Amino acid sequence: MTPLSPILTNFYADHNNHHWLVTRDPVLCCTILMLSSRYHVLPGAGGESRNFFIHHRLWQHCQQLVVRLIFGQEKSSHTRIRSIGTIEALLLMSEWHPRSLHFPPESDGWDSDLVLAPEHQESEGSSADRWLEDMIEPAKRSDQMSWMLLGSALSLAHELGIFELDDKKCDYTSVYEGSISDDQIKLRRQRVQRLLYVYINQLAWRIGCVSLMPQSLSHAIAGRQISRALSQPGDEWLAFMDSWMDLTKLAKSVTDTFFPSVSFARQQFHSGRYIDLLDHFRTLLVRWKDDHLRPQGRHSPFQSSGFSLIPSSMNANIF
């Protein structure tokens, strides 16, 4: 699963560093195990049922850790929960969801949903309503969960000083003292900045909400360059992230131009003025594709998994 996600570095892929994963980043450790247990079936008899049980127990523990994070219920003053690894864990959970998201939650008390019985209407729209409930609602729940997790990740990033230019104001290194090198911590911090920018802005446009990230901070992150001296040999993450950042900025420009408000968008479509704007953005999209998808025939795992989501019809119409 790691090659399909741009969130984690290769540091914890080394077995020699698993001790630090367990002791320094407990939330990230539990999240990795929880997500892996959903998609990896254990060998032997009863592997699928054991896999289901392990995933459910790990998800319960992840929920407890998130509750501790939100309500500040750390068991000691030297907490391991408020760290860069927890931000990475929240990003992972917003990208790879637990199985129980689409099942009714366990209830140990009064639930108003049990009192309000659904209205049964025998009408022509019943099949459409059923389709909405079966197909659209699960996707909506996924987006809602991701939105809340990303909000928590952004809040924790501000608390730790992830976006501060002055390292003296940062509070994200104390957890890793004596275990992880300063260069590795700095690299993870810079990666988290860009990942939050991309994930929050793209999800905000998809669900029709205002981005949680202030405009000034978005410009600052987009303008910062990650030092390639910190990257690992052969790491294609920087090239992929540069292309993703450029595409995100371009998508934001399209959204701000075409859809600043419902009335303005309707006026644009009725007047036909949007045709000239389409030609303008088509040129920019072609330039982006030439810069990031065609040179040297390079295709990283990130590009294959991320940009393959662009529909072929969109490629034909835009590119």
What are these regions (language model features)?
Residues 99-108, 118-222, 240, 245-249:
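Acidic/serine-rich, low-complexity amphipathic helices located in mid- to C-terminal regulatory regions
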Residues 1-7, 16-23, 44, 101-104, ...:
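Intrinsic, low-complexity transcriptional activation domains
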Residues 53-68, 86, 105-129:
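A short glycine/small-residue-enriched secondary-structure motif
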Residues 1-87, 92-93, 97, 163, ...:
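Acidic, Ser/Thr/Pro-rich intrinsically disordered transcriptional activation regions
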